[in-house]
Amino acid sequence: AEMLQVLAQDMGLNNLSYLGFHKTGASGSDPVIHSTYDPAWLTRYQEENYHLIDPVVDKSLEGTLPVDWSELPKVDRTTRNFFGEAMEFGVRQNGVSIPIRDHAHGKAVLTLNSDLRIHEWRKYKRGIIADAIYLGCLIQSDIVANLASAPPGPRLSTREKEVLKWAAVGKTAWETGQ
């Protein structure tokens, strides 16, 4: 997050955020989040699994073009409540989210967030979007490389898996050993 803070400042943004979905471990594709947003918002976002209802994430993951938040329909209550709550935590109205794909079929979203006035934001966005797309690819590449170099989780034998399964249903060690 420290590097993102430096990048956000250098780019004149209020916030810069990366949300990635990678197949790691037994949990499938839990999101990897690196962000300059308020830590309280990040905690809430993760605890409530907001990535499952976040219209920005949804639209970004289904497409390949940058998603300007102002172009998202905000007609349903869930979306309005989500954006309202985000604003309470300092997330600004102006944002653009960039979908990222990688060779390992990972998906991610890089989000730029600003409190510029709308006409300034549109001009700023036009001037920065190509660099932001490239930045997203660099961040994704770095994160995927770090995930690949992480030691793999423990591999369980068939018998070890069977023992865990029996323990999970309440069998004693003696019963499992029979």
Language model: regions and residue ranges:
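GAF sensory/regulatory domain recognition
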Residues: 20-44
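Sensory-domain boundary capping and coupling elements
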Residues: 101-116
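Helix-turn-helix DNA-binding segment
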Residues: 146-178
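Regulatory sensory and allosteric helical modules in signal-transduction proteins
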Residues: 35-88
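Short, hydrophobic-rich beta-strand element in sensory/regulatory alpha-beta domains
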Residues: 2-9, 13-26
